[in-house]
Amino acid sequence: LTTPVRRRVRQFLPWALASIAAVFAILTFVWFVNPPTVESEAAQPTDAVVVFAGNPARLETAVELMENGVAPYLVIPNGNTSDVGTNLCEEQASFEVFCPDTEEISTWGEAQEIGRLALGRGWSRLTAVTSVYHVHRATTLLRRCYEGEIEVVTPQRDIDSEWVGKVGHEWIGLLASIVLYPTC
């Protein structure tokens, strides 16, 4: 490269990198820190509450929603893979619990199974429960498999010391879902 071209590249490069970093920071905030969700107390009635696998706080939030009468059905894909989930799947509750096994133990597998179940039962409105950092990827995949309305509730702001690693995982998972799972 000639000297004037190099000079222009050196002048442009910091601005380009700063712009990319700014876009990345904004998307991270909107998608993984402050996504659109509803407080559990304000959740509207839906056909079912669906839980994406993860920490016990998600299941506790889902049970709270069920006890508040948000929906008649609770869906816990791969629910028998955790102690709390197994208890809900095997014990009698005041609401009906579905614990389907998925073909793939992943957010995509869960979205597929939730979509199949919702279609088969004629559900048109769901309440999805997941962690705040997982909302964007979970709803992106669920919308590929389910055409109805989705309201999202998260456990009380569950951002903790491991949050940075979780957001990194979600970025990788989101990019993988775009490439590997473009459709349901």
Ranges and model annotations:
Residues 32-168:
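A structural signal for short, hydrophobic/glycine-enriched beta-strand patches
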Residues 35-38, 180-184:
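Perimembrane helix-loop junctions in membrane proteins
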